[in-house]
Curated annotation (Swiss-Prot):
Major localization class: membrane
Lineage: Bacteria, Bacillati, Bacillota, Clostridia, Eubacteriales
Pfam families, alphabetized: AA_permease_2 (PF13520)
Similarity remark: Belongs to the amino acid-polyamine-organocation (APC) superfamily. Basic amino acid/polyamine antiporter (APA) (TC 2.A.3.2) family.
The protein, known as: Putative amino-acid transporter CPE0389
A Gene Ontology molecular function term of the record: transmembrane transporter activity
TM spans (from-to): 7-27, 36-56, 87-107, 127-147, 156-176, 208-228, 241-261, 289-309, 338-358, 364-384, 401-421, 422-442, 461-481
PANTHER family: AMINO ACID TRANSPORTER-RELATED, ARGININE_ORNITHINE ANTIPORTER-RELATED
Length: 481
């Protein structure tokens, strides 16, 4: 690839930050305060920050230890555990983010309803579907023009989404009162005048926020996913660190500073996006306008970068023979043209179906969301494998082997916790979607290696187990329906 078309540390950090900071962050104060006090929220961010650090650090170490393993999440799966595992990582990531991107379309239209009521109410009426489809194909052509150009536009979008958050935090900083913040700090009292109620013990409060804190870091792998287009793998490591620190700081301040201006009870009852409700109360209607514009910019920026990311993995998998060959096509701008087109067509079909889906859409979004989580676990397990067996682990990088092994062990424990916290039932149903990819893998293997068996002996047993679990998942799916 032409070096001029490769991504530097700023563009890569923009990918990470934009992938994590979606429109949902603008309702974080209410989400966190719904059933937790300031003290519990603080503990929750400390626990999550430590856990996610081991995931982020895994990506940093692997980028340095295996600079040849570009398009990380997919490649780590294949190098560590074979082509079938690598395929499942690419397939799962691709499908789940196709659904997630359609979620951005619905959220964008619903956000536009603030400025143009009631035309886009709910985000899934026919006008919303039409306008969402228009944005979907505009993003397709932007990415088709080149990943470098899309990433440059994303840097502008990232700045655009950070500015409203900076205004919000600055206003709150000057309005912050320690006396308010420490009133019922642990949520163990009932204070009627500020709408506070006894929230129960500290542990239940922390647990109630953990699901929120887990999901807001989805996208930490952003720089790794597009690492095949990075100028340097060192830049991938730096970008992951910058993205993690920036988002952790923003999330913590967004959750805690409002509790120095309003009580937990007051914030928990605010309408989404709660940042708009807070700023409107403090500086008037302009505050609400600023934050709602921020939501729209955040959605567009995240939608753009997730489109880049979800088209990369099938492209990389096709290059190594675990996706059909046609997905390896690039255009003159070195954009993964067929992978991008296939992704956009899938998203278009899903977007049309959203109009009819109702509650089924929310359930499907929850199911597909958990499909990204095994990618984290496979990455930490791969790091453990190369450090434990000392498989050519380099001695000249920033992380010594023992340090990397500790990171891998703790990251793996946290990865298992992520899957457990997401819900075993949802994971079982998600396995149905994983199993649907098996024919695609078989087709790809027959195309690239017609004289070899599609599966190794271990992979064959793994595929059988996957199919059995998928059948169990179907039972759960029919129960939910």
């Amino acid at each position: 690839m032409n070096d001029n078309k490769k991504l530097g540390v700023i563009a890569l950090a923009g990918v990470v930050i934009s992938a994590m900071l979606g429109g949902g962050v603008y309702n974080l104060p209410q989400n966190m305060a719904q059933s937790a006090s300031a003290g519990a929220i603080l503990i929750s961010w400390i626990i999550t920050g430590i856990g996610i650090w081991f995931i982020a650090n895994t990506f940093r170490i692997l980028a340095a230890a295996r600079p040849d393993a570009t398009t990380g999440i997919y490649t780590y799966g294949e190098l560590g555990f074979g082509k079938f595992t690598g395929f499942l990582m690419a397939w799962g990531y691709w499908i789940c983010n196709s659904f997630a991107n359609v979620g951005y379309a619905v959220l964008l239209m619903d956000s536009l309803n603030y400025f143009f009521p009631p035309y886009f109410k709910g985000g899934n009426n026919w006008l919303s579907i039409a306008c969402g489809s228009l944005v979907l194909w505009i993003i397709f052509f932007i990415v088709l023009a080149g990943v470098k150009q899309a990433s440059a536009l994303n840097v502008i979008g990232t700045i655009g989404k950070l500015l409203p958050l900076a205004i919000f935090l600055l206003v709150l900083l000057f309005s912050f009162r320690f006396s308010t913040f420490f009133t019922d700090f642990w949520g163990l009292k009932t204070v009627a005048k500020v709408h506070d109620t006894n929230l129960g013990g500290i542990l239940p409060q922390v647990k109630s926020t953990m699901l929120v804190t887990l999901w807001v870091f989805t996208g930490i792998e952003g720089a790794v996913v597009v690492s095949g287009r990075a100028k340097s793998q060192k830049d991938v490591s730096k970008a992951t660190f910058l993205g993690f620190i920036t988002c952790l700081l923003i999330y913590t301040l967004l959750s805690l500073l409002p509790l120095g201006v309003y009580s937990q009870g007051e914030i928990s009852k605010m309408a989404p996006p709660s940042t708009a409700a807070v700023l409107m109360d403090l500086i008037g209607n302009w505050g609400s306008v600023i934050m709602n514009l921020g939501v729209i910019i955040a959605i567009l920026s995240s939608w753009l970068i997730w489109t880049v990311m979800l088209s990369e993995l099938p492209f990389a998998a096709a290059q190594s023979g675990t996706f059909p060959k046609i997905f390896a096509k690039e255009n003159k701008n070195e954009s993964p043209s067929f992978s991008l087109l296939a992704s956009t067509i899938i998203m278009q079909i899903i977007l049309i179906l959203v109009h009819f889906a109702g509650n089924a859409w929310n359930m499907m979004l929850s199911i597909t969301s958990v499909m990204a989580l095994p990618c984290y676990l496979v990455s930490t397990l791969y790091l453990f494998k190369i450090t434990y067996k000392n498989e050519n682990y380099p001695t000249d990088i920033f992380a010594k082997r023992k340090y990397a092994m500790i990171t891998a062990i703790l990251g793996s424990i946290y990865g298992v916790w992520l899957i457990y916290a997401a819900g075993i039932n949802y994971m079982l149903i998600a396995i149905v979607i994983y199993a649907l990819g098996i024919p695609v893998f078989i087709k790809a293997r027959r195309e690239t290696s017609p004289n070899e068996k599609e599966f190794t002996k271990v992979e064959r047993y793994f595929a059988i187990v996957l199919i059995i679990l998928a059948l169990i998942g179907l039972v759960y799916l029919f129960k939910f329906m």
